[in-house]
Amino acid sequence: MPVIYINLIAAFFMAFMGLLIYRSHLMSSLLCLEGMMLSLFILNSTLALSMHFTLYSMMPIILLVFAACEAALGLSLLVMVSNTYGLDYVQNLNLLQC
């Protein structure tokens, strides 16, 4: 396995560990999710280039579309929560209240 794949997998798991550690703030969680999606995008792009498989070349673009939708939804949720409650602490929010 080439070194670049090991580095990209390590970057994914570091972002995942950051997501587990910094889950109290919504902004930190969103940044860690973006790091995970970026490492997956680069990994899929390098795999698509090295495999020369035509159908697999669309996979990074589809992943990038999902990452953009996830980022837009996460930022809109962050703006809504910060306007409503004035903070982005996830632990202080109770989603069962109306």
Curated annotation (Swiss-Prot):
Q: Which reaction does it catalyse?
A: a ubiquinone + NADH + 5 H(+)(in) = a ubiquinol + NAD(+) + 4 H(+)(out)
What broad class describes the main subcellular location of this protein?
mitochondrion
Domain of life from the UniProt record: Eukaryota
Q: Name one Pfam family in it.
A: Oxidored_q2
Q: Name one GO cellular component term.
A: mitochondrial inner membrane
Q: Which GO terms describe its biological process?
A: ATP synthesis coupled electron transport
State its location(s): Mitochondrion inner membrane
Q: Which GO terms describe its molecular function?
A: NADH dehydrogenase (ubiquinone) activity
Spans traversing the lipid bilayer: 1-21, 29-49, 61-81
Q: How does it sit in the membrane?
A: Multi-pass membrane protein
UniProt entry keywords in alphabetical sequence: Electron transport, Membrane, Mitochondrion, Mitochondrion inner membrane, NAD, Respiratory chain, Translocase, Transmembrane, Transmembrane helix, Transport, Ubiquinone
- EC identifiers of the protein: 7.1.1.2
Described function: Core subunit of the mitochondrial membrane respiratory chain NADH dehydrogenase (Complex I) which catalyzes electron transfer from NADH through the respiratory chain, using ubiquinone as an electron acceptor. Part of the enzyme membrane arm which is embedded in the lipid bilayer and involved in proton translocation.
Subunit field text: Core subunit of respiratory chain NADH dehydrogenase (Complex I) which is composed of 45 different subunits.
The record's comment on protein family reads:
Belongs to the complex I subunit 4L family.
Q: What is this protein called?
A: NADH-ubiquinone oxidoreductase chain 4L
Q: Which organism is it from?
A: Echinops telfairi (Lesser hedgehog tenrec)
Gene name, per UniProt, is MT-ND4L
